């Protein structure tokens, strides 16, 4: 065995117990003491090592998306979009790429029930020949805020109160009363889709706007959509109470059991694209993450399919240590000027460095499957074997060179440095259109959830009035019904 290239693996376990350094352990049942009943000796290194390792088994949980489940599989291109992108893994129909996917709830802690009303994370890591691509999205196509400056405040509002450690509706209602752009997202969250039946029966969305670039350098703005082949199914409120009371890990269990039984979940990938030269033609800003792109004027285009056919081998190694970041892209896919995406580019990598350390991309689940090379050396928990003498660039003693230049969006940007909101806010139209698309029973369930949320005794008359005004601007009848059930007069 080459000691410099050996990597610890359960596949090379010895037949007897050892310490972490490989020394044999002849007794893993009793501590070393002075006599049968005497005190424990500090020299019992195996005991100290065992306790110290146990004390450090847990790492900081994710500040959001803490509760999650992962599975592995492949993505296969089914339709040619090479005219839109030069991304290698999308180069032709039939091309397959290994993936790992993590589904999650967003707000609540690691051990919370999977039946709570909450957005669901839908993150996909593609292990391509040109490096990894992380498509980090949710099961809802829009978001609560359009500017990442408000993200920490938003999460604080959703998280338990720093005083009571309980999630409290009045805090959420208060914060979002200052952000009417959130109404479109709430038209999803307070709808039936706010509690998916399980992970197999929910959609996924890239949420943010990205950019596709073809080999000629032509860019197109793009939105990504995952559609489950088994359909979208949800839990109503009373069903969620029953299911959650029976098994608080029902979605994880369903995913694991389905794959183990050979009933592999599958999603179709679709995209919507907009020529950047045409982005001013709409009554909304295509870079506004609180808006969807209407499918009747920007149709879905099929791209491929994703099949999850293998359960993870170890929850900690392939779920807790699994790390996503929207900044991780490949040639042919680029960012856009979406304000929330621009913020996520920094924040995700930063939180992974906090959670897992500066070398988190060396962990097997996060490392690319292709060859890679740079001078990002050393740091805490660096376990890459290196024997180079040159750790700088350029050098006449190292043949490493720059890669071929890849196309990036050829935009010329001008403007003053300023902090401002976008021109086309249009906060109410799409939320109202979505509400009117519900059948009467679904509308009533949506209405009742808002009545319950606004009935919190800490919510003031002023706050209720603001929300009635907001929903009235989305749909007059919805505002009237909400006011009636709350015994208030609608105020436009």
From Swiss-Prot:
Occurs in almost all aerobically respiring organisms and serves to protect cells from the toxic effects of hydrogen peroxide. May prevent the excessive accumulation of H(2)O(2) during water stress in response to the accumulation of abscisic acid (ABA). Involved in the modulation of ROS levels related to root growth regulation. Required for pollen viability and floret fertility upon heat stress (HS) by detoxifying reactive oxygen species (ROS) and malondialdehyde (MDA) accumulation in developing anthers exposed to HS. Keywords: Cell membrane, Glyoxysome, Heme, Hydrogen peroxide, Iron, Membrane, Metal-binding, Oxidoreductase, Peroxidase, Peroxisome, Phosphoprotein, Stress response, Thioether bond. Gene3D superfamilies: Catalase core domain. GO terms for molecular function: catalase activity; heme binding; metal ion binding. GO terms for cellular component: cytoplasm; glyoxysome; peroxisome; plasma membrane. The lineage of its organism: Eukaryota, Viridiplantae, Streptophyta, Embryophyta, Tracheophyta. This is Catalase isozyme B. Optimum temperature is 25 degrees Celsius.
């Amino acid at each position: 065995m080459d000691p410099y290239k050996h990597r610890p693996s359960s596949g090379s376990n010895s037949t007897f117990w050892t310490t972490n350094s490989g020394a044999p352990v002849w007794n893993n049942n009793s501590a070393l003491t002075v006599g049968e009943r005497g005190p424990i000796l500090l020299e019992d290194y195996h005991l100290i090592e065992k306790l110290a390792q146990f004390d450090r088994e847990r790492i900081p949980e994710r500040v959001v998306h803490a509760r999650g489940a992962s599975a592995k599989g492949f993505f296969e291109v089914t339709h040619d979009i090479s005219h839109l992108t030069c991304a290698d893994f999308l180069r032709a129909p039939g091309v397959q790429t290994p993936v790992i996917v993590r589904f999650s709830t967003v707000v609540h802690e690691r051990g919370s029930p999977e039946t709570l009303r909450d957005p669901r994370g839908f993150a996909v890591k593609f292990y391509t020949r040109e490096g990894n691509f992380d498509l980090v999205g949710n099961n809802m196509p829009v978001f609560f805020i359009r500017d990442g400056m408000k993200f920490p405040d938003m999460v604080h509002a959703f998280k338990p109160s720093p005083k009571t450690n309980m999630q409290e509706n009045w805090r959420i209602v208060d914060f979002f009363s200052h952000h009417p752009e959130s109404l479109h997202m709430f038209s999803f969250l307070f709808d039936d889709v706010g509690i998916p039946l399980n992970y197999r029966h929910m959609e996924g969305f890239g949420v943010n706007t990205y950019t596709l670039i073809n080999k000629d350098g032509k860019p197109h703005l793009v939105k990504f959509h995952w559609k489950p082949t088994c359909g979208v199914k949800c839990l109503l409120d009373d069903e969620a109470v029953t299911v959650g009371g029976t098994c608080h890990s029902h979605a994880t269990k369903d995913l694991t059991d389905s794959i183990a039984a050979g009933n592999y979940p599958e999603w179709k990938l679709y995209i919507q694209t907009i020529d950047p030269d045409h982005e001013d033609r709409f009554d909304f800003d295509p870079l506004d993450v609180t808006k969807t792109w209407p499918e009747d004027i920007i149709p879905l285009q099929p791209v491929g399919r994703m099949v999850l056919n293998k359960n993870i081998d170890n929850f900690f190694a392939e779920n807790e240590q699994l790390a996503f970041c929207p900044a991780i892209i490949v040639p042919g896919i680029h960012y856009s000027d979406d304000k929330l995406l621009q913020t996520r580019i920094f924040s995700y990598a930063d939180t992974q460095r906090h959670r897992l350390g500066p070398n988190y991309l060396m962990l097997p689940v996060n490392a690319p499957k292709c060859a890679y090379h740079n001078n990002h050396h050393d740091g805490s928990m660096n376990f890459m074997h290196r024997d180079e003498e040159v750790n700088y660039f350029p050098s006449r003693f190292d043949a490493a060179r720059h890669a071929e230049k890849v196309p990036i969006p050829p935009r010329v940007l001008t403007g003053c440095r300023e902090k401002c909101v976008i021109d086309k806010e249009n906060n109410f139209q799409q939320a109202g259109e979505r509400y009117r698309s519900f059948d009467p029973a679904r509308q009533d369930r949506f209405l009742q959830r808002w009545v319950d949320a606004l009935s919190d005794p800490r919510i003031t008359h002023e706050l209720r009035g603001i929300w009635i005004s907001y929903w009235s601007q989305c749909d007059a009848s919805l505002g009237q019904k909400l006011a009636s059930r709350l015994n208030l007069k609608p105020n436009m």
